[in-house]
UniProtKB/Swiss-Prot annotation:
Single GO biological process annotation from the record: 'de novo' CTP biosynthetic process
Protein name: CTP synthase
Active site per database record: C374 (nucleophile), H500, E502
Molecular function GO terms recorded: ATP binding; CTP synthase activity; glutaminase activity; identical protein binding; metal ion binding
Species lineage: Archaea, Methanobacteriati, Thermoplasmatota, Thermoplasmata, Thermoplasmatales
Organism for this UniProt entry: Thermoplasma acidophilum (strain ATCC 25905 / DSM 1728 / JCM 9062 / NBRC 15155 / AMRC-C165)
Amino acid sequence: MQYIVVTGGVISGLGKGTITSSIGHILKDSGIKVSAVKIDPYINYDAGTMNPYQHGEVFVLDDGGEVDLDLGNYERFMNINLSRDNNITTGKVYLEVIQKERHGDYLGKTVQIIPHITDEIKRRIREVARTSGADVVLIEVGGTVGDIESMPFLEALRQLKREEQNVVFAHVTLVPEIGPTMEQKTKPTQHSVKALREIGIQPDIIFARSKQKLTEETKSRISLFTDVPVEGIISVSDVENVYLLPQMMVNEGLITRLSKLLNMNIEYRDSWTSYAENIRHPRDRVKVAIVGKYVDLHDAYISHKEAFSHVTGNTGIAVDIMWIDSEKVKNDQSVLSEADAILIPGGFGYRGVEGKIAATRYAMENGVPFLGICLGFQVAVIAVARYVLGLDGANSTEFDEKTKYPVVDILPEQRGVKDMGGTMRLGSKKVVIKKGTLAHRIYGADVIYERHRHRYEVNPDYIDMIEKAGFKFSATDEEGIRMEILERPGDESFIATQYHSEFKSRPLDPSKVHLHLVEQALIFKHRRMGENHEGYATAASSQGQ
């Protein structure tokens, strides 16, 4: 068992998560079993109640864990499934230690940061290593070196290396380029490594973020002041797509350095060759409008972005995302006029819902390919009730408790639930698909397992009415009680799901409903242009299998 710890310095947002994921991908593609841990120094127990504007998307795992979006990157890059235990927060650590103290586990001792907090951190890391059976566990430490919140975690990791000797430290820093000559400045990296060394950690690898590739002179200067060999200075310059990063790091000599540090024979097979080629040189493009309320922060919908990137890598059809604020759509649907497809993602709260309903109506009435996810599924049901069934004012009780037509209502088991954190219908659930439906053709299966995150469902009292109006609920939960997929028979371009298919999308196995949406968008685009490309998307689909 070996550990690779990835820390960050100078500023946040340098891409530690993507670099950690890329290291994991390289090792996984070399036949090495990997797992990953994200350390988040915030006091929240998990990411479940966080505002997407502050923290980005809340990623949902198979076991129902609501975690940092970096775990989504780990799963996608390494093609592994993680659990809530792979996300360690200050809140989890302190709560466990306090509960042990209340239980009397410390036998009256004074409970302190060292050793009790640090011991709990190490215990959690070792438990992930044990249960995963991984050869290498990657550990990303959130924040930057010097942050007061991360100090106990860095101390625990220093102790981990002292106790086990099988820990590699990698540090991500910024090398800014200043002035008319764009001179690469190493001083921020020098000071960042100095801060790390002051707490007893000497990095073995430095990932230097910059706009342009580091010069050999810059690498030598960083090496001189940090005691990291030149071959351990890895230049990480900007790339057009994050899935091109692993090959860049390989070209920089990362495998040679890791092989020496881990004492492993690393033979990278690069399973993404054709995938990367499709990303670099797409053969066609479509515009997909994502209509949401957090569109100013694209990371709030990062799994949708990545799912579309996966479609591009498998089909060569690039997706240009139009980020549309749902509040603007309510009174002006013209903002959707250039879209080849519309996606309504998940969300909570009343703000922007009427705009999402308007966007759904626009798609239905203009034949624009449509995909609704979670709240988007519920919004589709509301739109059908209002504009097809004529139930004026139909709504979800989430937004209007006194609506005359509550076509979407709270789950029975959610009634009376007071706590917000970790109490929704969460995680992987069995979905049973009806034969002879669009959903069955898309998935090619009778049963699938998808991840959920919701408190509300289609009101059973309105199911027959909606189906008699020309729509069909083509999938349900295992008991046949909860509706999971809505489609319109005879219309290949309209589908909505209660589950979050984006959370299970992988580079070589893209979300099937996102893939279908892009196929339909391509047909719509060329039909609108007056061209006959009926067979084009089918060919693209076969390439994506």
